Amino acid sequence: GHFHNPELLGVRKIIRKTHFHNLDLIPSNLRLYNLEYEIAGHMARNQNMEIIDLIAQAIDEVVDDYDVVIMDPPPALGMVSMAVLQAANSMVIPVPPSLVDFASTVSFIDMTRTTMKQLEQLAGRGRPAYNFIRLVGSRVDESKSMHREILSMMRQVFGGSMTQSVMVTS
């Protein structure tokens, strides 16, 4: 199908310039939202996992035009997120300093590990080799003692994978 050809996907056509110098983006849209269902449908019909490489193929088409390509998939392990995980060479996972978000992130990492192993078995492929995986505190208000305590706990649990720098609440 047309999913395997990034030219037909038209990745160059959907890249938009921003008012920031040398920062382009592909805005989320209904077509990307529908991609979740299209990928699942394609996999069910064709009984193969090649479609999971769709995003990697699209990025390969334009990767030489950029220093860094940042992908921001939904925080769920759907087909689009799996395709992003396959296409990525590094990960930065934002974690707000709340117990619910911390627990959610631990669960997400465990589910991702399991899902990637299943994908490896189903597709007969190796897991992606990431240059790095880092967790970063996000929406942090360092004047709140609870935020400081939870960040400290996250650093103990995640060790060197947790950045010292945080993204503060703005």
Feature locations, PLM:
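P-loop NTP-binding core
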Residues: G1-S170
